[in-house]
Amino acid sequence: MSDRTLVVSASNLLSRGFLVVPTDRRSRDGEPVNALFAVARAIHRVLAFKLPARAVAVLEASPNLTGWPPLLVPQLAGLRGLLEALGVHVVEAPDEVHVVASYARAALAAGDDAIVVGVDKRYAQLVSERLWWYDANKDARYTPEIVHKRFTVPPGKVAEWLALVGDDDALPGVKGIGAKGATTLIEGHGSIAGALAALDTITGRLGNALRAARDDVPRELARARLDTERPLPVALTALGYAPPDVAAQNALYDRLGFAELLSHDGDAIRVEPCATADDLAAALARLGARPIGVAASREVEPPAGREDSPAGSIALHALLEDPAPVRAALTGIALAAGTGEACYVARTSAAWPALVRWLEDASAPKLGHELVATTVALHHAGIRLAGVIGDSAFASHLSQPSNWAPHDLPLVAKHVLGRALPDEDAVRGVGRARKRWDTLPIDRAAAIAGQSAAAASAVWHALSPTVDPALLAEYRELSDTLVRMELTGLIVDPDELTGAEAAFATLEVELAQQIEALAGHPFNINSSKQLGSVLFEELKLPIASHTKTGWSTSIEALERIEHAHPIVALVLRWRQLRRLRDSWLNTLRRCIDSDGRVHSRFHPARSFSGHLINTNPDLARVPGRTPEMQRIRRAFVAPPGRVLMSVDYHQLGLYVLAHLTRDPALVDPLRQRADMHVLTAAAVLDRPAESITVDDRQLGKVVNFATFAGQGASALALQLGVSAQDARQLIARFDQRYAQVRAFQDEQLRLARERGYIVTLAGRRWPIGGLESLDPQDRSYAERLARRATHEGSVSDVSRRGLLEADRALRRAGLATVPVLQILDEVLFEVPEAELAEAARVAATAMRHAFELEVPLVVGIEAGPTWADLVPIAPA
């Protein structure tokens, strides 16, 4: 078997890799490293095929940095060091691509196989049975067969094909000749020279295009061809590959933040099941924890979350039988630290009572991943978890809110540690065949739990030093609030649900009859094809969006054209009823626990923006905008002697935006409690505020939220049912009135380009990827996100802090009022009737002062026996 020579087109790999790895990837020092990561990842992938005998990376001696993005330029300085850490020799030479080609040819001449790593399509012409090209951006290895399939010509004709078709700015190609035309010319005439010689016989569009470029084609061909005869800066024999020093490479990767590429050789986790209390004591000693029952000098305090976290911090992972923590059967718990060892205690083990004492010991510092669910499940097993100092899910969310969402442990471990956790589905099965944890051999259950605990520990220690400790502390306290909310839950009246279902069924039939009357004939409303035919072919309504097979009839698409015809609003309402009956009501019934309450799960780390998500059931799907939704809200009731109280921020988005922008056109009216939607409508319609109607105000509201969200004229036109020109005029008038809002959004986009992230009011970093994408749609989306993300994330900060401050203040005041739900800007509390006035005062005050904004926050307070029957009240 031949030796292999690895040839890396380093500058090319760096510049092109910048476009495919999100620019929010940063080193521990905050420096951009996305392009360097692309280089390292590509070489790691190639080395996984087969270790080379020789390895060389060619750097462009005098690279032309014109047009390089600002975040890319500083990464060039670190390229040589990175390559050398990978064991690759580095040479500098002008005309990088030709020197790469020459090294590849020299390797073949010396009897080696070769693999070229780069992103330039010209490397495809080098491919042979003994030479592969690896396109790092596509993660694709090209053999002669794959080159022929990709370019429709063999490797020997790729240069001619590229000369005609072109490839980015370096190879403009021939105008009017695409991939199919180039293949036709080359196959029909054997070569470009043959095509030019027979030019008089080539008719049609291809002939015209080739004739127009007759003088340019030879020059394009010269650009496309690689010269394999360039002098080699360093002889091939001097470029022997030696595997790098793993410790030094890991140290570099740790500094650069390349956790996925860290070497974990020898990191296999050894998991020991504990049968007795003595086994557990010995295991805890090996993990570096204090013995059970030995008091610490002080109770641990939640958390600083940095390298100075309390010594002996142990990560735990519980095996739960049901995904709903309040119903979860607890099978066992694994403990791990950074020692390469873990232990597992089954609930049936004699070691369990000793483990419970450790779990409830507030002086024993503990870590975990998504510990809200674990804490709730332990509570229902009679265990009060204490001493938690950190949650790796929070560290992941605060480090990379978007890239690693939804931040479940297998995904985060893959990204941060480069480690694949055991596949539970492969071990337990799926569906009805799924095995219970307690039916598995204990060593298999222990291995899964132990590796998960070890991963949680490793993720925490890798990420927590990169996150503001104050934010980690805030999220840690928030998790205590969420545990109490999950444990409390909300009472649901099943009889009210039954009555709602019957009423919805009757109304659904009535709506279907009205829809068919407007259509002029019966049809299957539930059929996208038939509905689309009625709306877009028969009624000629505007098409809001398309799918691969035609027009879209999704809810989002229909909401954009709701103004166009009365039938659309009826269809939307019919669909809502159908969904409520078929899924939501049944789901809600299934979620009612034995105590008559639904215990929704809360996830503070799953949304990019930071707003709280709830599931099982998702109570955010019960807004009170329609009579049907109000009917469902009526099923949520307070127990005897208590009421439900809602504290809701008033126009929170506008108050936060006023603070961020300091725009007088926002600040001054909000200080006077003016209706901002009326003022916006007056501005964009160029009319006095006194003349604004209810419909006009709705237009102002749509313009406000659409523009704050960074939408363009096309999207706004669809929402309002106006022409794109009219929408542009509305936006122009909006920008004229709120000039500092637009300036603020422009500045956020600039900062996102410069830093790779935005910063919210609470100091959270939200990385924005895709700003340098070659895909116009991806780039446009990233730009809109960058414009709105600071505002959107800051609104979530206020909502989260408001919930936390309200719960903290109520407990400090000794009140029995508890929060039970948060949906966006609203917090719902369960309140003893006797303390309603005081609870309203305490909660409202705390939420108003969650952040001190330019214009003080305003909250509304309502209370009543059900969620649907809330009426305004005044606090004490």
Where on the chain are the PLM-derived regions?
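Conserved "right-hand" nucleotidyltransferase catalytic core of DNA-directed polymerases
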Residues: 213-347, 430-630, 637-643, 650-653, ...
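Conserved catalytic core of nucleic-acid polymerases
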Residues: 435-438, 480-487, 542-544, 593-607, ...
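Non-catalytic, usually N-terminal nucleic-acid engagement modules in DNA/RNA processing proteins
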Residues: 1-67
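Short beta-strand
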Residues: 93, 116, 524-526, 818-823
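Active-site-proximal helix-loop-helix substrate-binding element of RNase H-like nuclease domains
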Residues: 90-91, 141-168, 270-272, 306-309, ...
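Short active-site loop/helix that positions an aromatic residue
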Residues: 14-23, 124-129, 333, 372-382, ...
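Extended two-metal-dependent nuclease catalytic cores across DNA- and RNA-processing enzymes
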Residues: 72-233
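C-terminal polymerase-core module
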Residues: 506-513, 517-569, 736-788, 792, ...
